[in-house]
Amino acid sequence: MKVDPNKEKALAAVLIQIEKQFGKGSIMKLGEDRSMDVETISTGSLSLDVALGAGGLPMGRIVEIYGPESSGKTTLTLEVIAAAQREGKTCAFIDAEHALDPIYAKKLGVDIDNLLCSQPDTGEQALEICDALTRSGAVDVIVVDSVAALTPKAEIEGEIGDSHMGLAARMMSQAMRKLAGNLKQSNTLLIFINQIRMKIGVMFGNPETTTGGNALKFYASVRLDIRRTGAIKDGDEVVGNETRVKVVKNKVAAPFKQAEFQILYGQGINRTGELVDLGVAHKLIEKAGAWYSYKGDKIGQGRANAGKYLTENPAIATEIDKTLRELLLSNPSALAAKDDASTEDNVDLETGEVF
């Protein structure tokens, strides 16, 4: 299609004017934007990284992680912080719930000496701290725990029983408008942990909703629904949880995928167990009876012993991890979908639509 040369000249002139006024990169053709290849940070779980499609959580975006109590929300964010710190990134934890356990964080691999931590008095203060850290351009990952604990100043200064209808939602809406652009410019990942509430009087569809209004749902590039699906036992003692994470919303890859992994108490995500399972599924690790072998060498009898071997030999674990990432991220459909999820589990949190 032939373009009018006068229009081309006018467009070139206005582009030069815009870049002169607002800076280089303020406007460009979509195909020229090299930043479309999204930089990511691992979640600590290989299967979740694959389910996300891009290999982890995207930098410069807002992410929401929600689920019931004790489902692993904070553990997952601490795993993200540990992964980011291993890459030399600076992280901050806004502890609005005043419940962060530094001993547990250290066990998960978090460098607590270099983790910035704030325990704000009000929701406005927490969000202003987020904005200041973002605009500095010096912080790579910020975690807010949690949206439900971001209490507006008016509510704190008022009396118990006073009505503050929609105050938290307005606060979050204003904060999202302010933060979204700054996050993109500074390439900062902002993770909000959220809790679940029940809608009153819902007869059909899913009665669950998240706190803080609708703004976060719209501005989040990724929303993760994390659930505990079972217990892991060592004899009669419960030592961890079977966990399922569903990608409810994803703006950087295809949504609605899910991942299953184990969270062990005091240890975090069971990476080596995940490597053994995925390695066997994709024929990187051979299994004969109860014995597991890698490249012809036996690595253990039983899944637990094979996982222990990989823990003691991190070079081999890294090699398997790298091979699996190359295989699965180039072909995400290779990660077999779990067919045992119930219809109720596959209901969109907001619309009630089955997917």
UniProtKB/Swiss-Prot annotation:
GO terms for biological process: DNA recombination; DNA repair; SOS response. It is found in: Cytoplasm. The keyword Cell membrane does not apply. Its main location: cytoplasm. One of its GO terms (molecular function) is ATP binding. Pfam families: RecA, RecA_C. Keywords: ATP-binding, Cytoplasm, DNA damage, DNA recombination, DNA repair, DNA-binding, Nucleotide-binding, SOS response. Belongs to the RecA family. This is Protein RecA. It comes from Shewanella baltica (strain OS195).
